């Protein structure tokens, strides 16, 4: 669940990095203050109100953090904006997390299921690649 309180930047960083590290491969790059500032500057997330970020912005940052290794951020932002026209950020976040953790449900929009599966396939491919590299460097016994 997303925090009910509005968060300052340092709290957002801690929360988003904690949540996304649980679902990412070990080579996942942590979210930084500069990244958030750039996302705000480019309109990928709304500006904080009185330096505080709301649930909607935190949910969007989590989605961007998970999806950015596979999809261009501009595309992620465009799709999220389109999805938010039909559902609230909280409903979309819950749908995304539910699919990510449990797989397909009947109410999962196809675009969310394909995006999640693409990220999981990418992570699995990278894991296999690392394993291949590790076996190359093992001495023959």
Which residues are covered by each model-predicted region?
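Intrinsically disordered, low-complexity, charge-dense segments enriched in Lys/Arg
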Residues: 79-141
């Amino acid at each position: 669940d997303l925090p009910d309180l509005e968060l300052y930047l340092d709290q957002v960083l801690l929360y988003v990095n904690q949540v996304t590290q649980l679902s990412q491969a070990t080579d996942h790059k942590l979210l930084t203050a500069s990244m958030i500032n750039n996302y705000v500057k480019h309109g990928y997330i709304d500006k904080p109100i009185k330096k505080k970020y709301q649930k909607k912005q935190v949910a969007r940052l989590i989605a961007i953090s998970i999806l950015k290794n596979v999809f261009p951020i501009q595309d992620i932002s465009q799709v999220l904006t389109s999805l938010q026209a039909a559902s609230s950020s909280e409903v979309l976040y819950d749908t995304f997390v539910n699919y990510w953790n449990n797989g397909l449900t009947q109410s999962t929009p196809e675009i969310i299921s394909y995006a999640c599966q693409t990220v999981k396939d990418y992570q699995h491919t990278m894991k296999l690649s690392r394993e291949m590299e590790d076996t190359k460097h093992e001495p023959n016994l």
